[in-house]
Amino acid sequence: MTYTLTAFERSPDRGRGLARDMRVRWAMEEVGQPYEVRLASFDALKQPSHLARSPFGQIPTLEDGDLVLFESGAIVLHIAQRHSGLLPVDERAMAWMFAAIGTLDPPIMERSMCALLERDQPWYAQRLAMLDRQVDTRLGQLSRWLGDADWLEGAFSAGDLMTVHVLLRLRGSGLLDAHPNLLAYVARGEARSAYQRAFAAQRAVFEAAT
């Protein structure tokens, strides 16, 4: 069965692979699951037809037959549960899926929004420095856990997929530079052929819209 993914018609990240549909694309490429894409404009996200799929009017959503899912973490978990190759053998390793979106992502996203929207504010430098410290604390904790390992819990799993995608938002910030093992970790994720196929697919959508 082919899944249907809802993604941005014109992604605000300008095709850099940071929108959350990228996580879902990557997961489907990892397990070899065919999918179709429904492209949505920002206006379409506000319409009743989309709100019936995603109550918060966001992307991504995924349709698997009669099942409709929203939230990227829930979608990636669904894919991992239904296909071999992404679900961790060790149940504890599943925690990394939720750590990525519940612990790592919030301060990283807050920093990203500050850098994007608050540069002209008088408090910008002080606030950015505070957010940098918060993010670096989490990076230090993650770095110590990873150590010299390739992946967080043995073999590559959905937890690594989610974590790598969250960390990619720090590219260009310099915050990963103090943690060489995390830089290498992200590079390993990007080097996976499934990631590269997913990135190319979302990039093609952006280029077609510009």
What does each model-found stretch correspond to?
Residues 82, 111, 173, 201-202:
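Residue-level signal for well-ordered alpha-helical positions
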Residues 37, 155, 179, 198-199:
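A generic structural-conservation signal
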Residues 41, 158, 202-203:
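Short, solvent-exposed turn/loop segments enriched in Gly/Ser/Thr/Pro and often Arg
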Residues 80, 166-167, 199:
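Active-site-flanking alpha-helical
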Residues 182-210:
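Long hydrophobic alpha-helical segments typical of transmembrane helices together
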Residues 86-96, 141-148, 168, 201-210:
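A short, terminal or domain-edge coil/loop segment
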Residues 100-191:
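GST-like fold's C-terminal all-alpha helical module
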Residues 1-126:
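GST-like domain detector, emphasizing the conserved glutathione-binding G-site
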